[in-house]
Amino acid sequence: MTVERVSAPTPAAFVDAANAAFRNGAVLSVQARCEVEYNGRTSGYLGDGDRLLVAKPDGTFLVHQPTGHKPVNWMPGGGTVEARTSQGDAVLLARRSNPTERVETRLHEVYGVTRFDAEDGATYEESGTEAEMHEYIEANPDALEAGLRIVEHERETKYGFIDFYAVDGDGTPVVIEVKRIQATLNHFDQLKRYVDRYAETNDDVRGMLVAPSASERVTRALRDNGLEFVALAEFGLDAKGATEAKLTDF
């Protein structure tokens, strides 16, 4: 693993360093004031500003602004990235042919460039998936409530599959819906539909929503409708994985 950094290179020195990194399969990161033009399925232009540029050996190219986790412009892998000079500026050109696309970044001032000869053969393995939550609950129903007994996993109804159909210590039916992410109002609505279906033949049926967490708005909606929430915080998601929910869901 090798890391080389050059501060404030001239356009010509930057082009030499960048193309050497591309030839040798290194990751290149650049801090620069630049403007970006995209042409392909649509077209777009991003005016002058300070940005972080990342070029990877597989042709992936990313343009990051100072805030936010998503790149403002990018090129997926499968293409090429090259450096050149044009009208006194250094230029990074990322392009691919299927579909035909190009991202041209004109660097008006390069603050720094880092070459990273990275080695990484690991594969990301996610733990705590929804399937693992189901396995855990099925093996440990007491984690939700003492005396709870699972009768059926993924029972089919006309509204869809209920995650768990159970009975509590008193023999009362319990409909359980499990979510991997923070519980939302959509999840509450789903559980309520299931419970209403069973309440047609048994007024005593209980409804239980299980998730790593829930907002006060969701727990209030559950409480106001006679439903319950159980938190399994150990299955909470971090920034590596979750499905995004709309603000109105909470």
Swiss-Prot record:
Name the source organism.
Halobacterium salinarum (strain ATCC 700922 / JCM 11081 / NRC-1)
List the lineage, top down: Archaea, Methanobacteriati, Methanobacteriota, Stenosarchaea group, Halobacteria
**What is the protein's name according to its record?**
Endonuclease NucS 2
Chief location bin: cytoplasm
Is this entry keyworded Cytoplasm? yes
Q: What is its EC number?
A: 3.1.-.-
The compartments listed are: Cytoplasm
Query: Which top class of enzyme applies to this chain?
Result: hydrolase
Function comment: Cleaves both 3' and 5' ssDNA extremities of branched DNA structures.
UniProt keyword annotations, A-Z: Cytoplasm, DNA-binding, Endonuclease, Hydrolase, Nuclease
Is the Zinc-finger keyword given for this protein?
A: no
Q: Which family does it belong to?
A: Belongs to the NucS endonuclease family.
Show the InterPro entries listed in the entry: Endonuclease_NucS, NucS_C, NucS_N, NucS_N_sf, tRNA_endonuc-like_dom_sf
Q: Name one GO molecular function term.
A: DNA binding
GO CC annotations on file: cytoplasm
Give the NCBIfam families listed for this entry.
Answer: PRK04247.1
